[in-house]
Amino acid sequence: MEQNKQNVGFYGGTLGPWLPMLAMITLMIISTATHTGGLNRVVLIAFACLALGFFLCKDKKHYGGITLKGLTNPMLGTILMAYILAGVLAQLMRQSGIISALIWAVTKAGLNTGFLPLIAFVVCMLISTSCGTSTGSVAAVAPVLVPLAASLNVDVGLMCGAIISGAIFGDNLAPISDTTISSALTQEAELGDVVRTRFPYAALSAVVSAGLFVWFGMKMSTGAAGALNLDGSTAKSLVLLVLPVLMVIMMRKGWDLIATLITCDVLGIVLNLVLGCIPLSKMLDGKGPVVAGMSGMMILVLYVLLLFQMLEILNASGAFENLNAGLLNMCKTPRSGELVCFLAASLGSFATGGSGIAILFFGSVVRSITKTFGIDRCRGANILDGVACGTTGLMPYGNPMLVSLGVVMALEKADPNFSFMNVIPYTFHCWGLLIIFLLSILTGIGRRYEEKKPVA
């Protein structure tokens, strides 16, 4: 079976298997630029590109079986359930009246709304560093702060960018993050050394990002929270803020994301009923938080199902292996070797849909390059992880972006044309990681070499 998987042929030579994915990204950008974006259009694009793969595949008779293998990826079930359960949590929070309560609290505190993006960034930094998960951090914070931003006339794209940036910070730096662990293991480096040497890059990007969030926050918000006239009748719903806190604690204690979300959803239902925020009749209604939360994520679920089938095209055709071999042939000097590591991490993330798989898949390539030129193994781990995480935060089909878009589309007055293009310009920390590591590679700043052990 493995041999058949590797021998699936596509018209177009080595570029053939990549054409559906490249076409999807191109069409998504065009759709957004022409104001015909949104998740509904993205699903149509994904379907069209999956069909393109069918016409490019030489073995059309078995194309369905080939692509359906992508749905056996163990990550898929976790991702889909996380979206659905996060959708329920978002609706439980929204329908409880917590947004009005938060606006009331902001009004009473006299807080300038321009600081909300910075607050979102810092909160997500703390959560993701504590839990080591970007998706979980976005799922915990976005359902609360995105609707709040929309209600206070803070740019929603800016708020999503702040949330994603904070989530990527911890995913890249936290010692318990899967990407941190994977990058250290694949590069044969000590985890403590990796975190220690990685911190200056992450900290520099975070400081610059924080300044940008303050500047853009002040520029793109009215700062008029104090002018709102609310009576605080929904203040009791502020008790539900215990849910994102509980998420952080549970994930920090080692609970997986699905178990954590189920627990928080159930507790959210109980709290809403006990506090009287949502009556039982509405809770059981078709427009209630449970049904609305699940159904609101269905477009996202459909897109991910199509996406994983498209990713399987790259696996079945051997496109990943060909890319691996091609990258190795490009290395001539330490600088070019590190540039190839940069390229492998970024292309790998785009091709696999996330940083975790890319690091595991291309880790051996990066380690082979760093060994060849005697580059410090921590240096390889930091380039691999920093670039992969930064790229994932920018990807239109990356988990952090998709969760954020799902929350935005669930807003009461959501802009049907809102898309990833409204968010990408403001994911400052993601851009920062990519720029800082690229400059480090080009200038040689931070490049260290392995100490040669004396011959006995």
Place the predicted regions along the sequence by residue.
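Hydrophobic alpha-helical transmembrane segments of multi-pass integral membrane proteins
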Residues: 80-88, 111-144, 328-368, 372-373, ...
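Juxtamembrane helix-boundary/capping and inter-helix hinge elements in multi-pass membrane proteins
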Residues: 58-61, 72-76, 153-157, 182-195, ...
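Short helix-coil transition sites and intra-membrane helix breaks within transmembrane domains
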Residues: 38, 78, 90-100, 115, ...
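Hydrophobic transmembrane alpha-helices of multi-pass small-molecule transporters
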Residues: 1-80, 198-303, 442, 446-456
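Alpha-helical transmembrane segments of multi-pass membrane proteins
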Residues: 114-127, 153-169, 336-349, 373-394, ...
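Membrane-interfacial loop-to-helix junctions in multi-pass transporters
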Residues: 73-79, 104-122, 149-159, 233-239, ...
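Juxtamembrane and boundary regions of transmembrane helices in multi-pass small-molecule transporters
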Residues: 34, 165-167, 172-232, 239, ...
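Core transmembrane alpha-helical segments of multi-pass membrane transporters/permeases
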Residues: 40-44, 64-100, 114-117, 285-321, ...
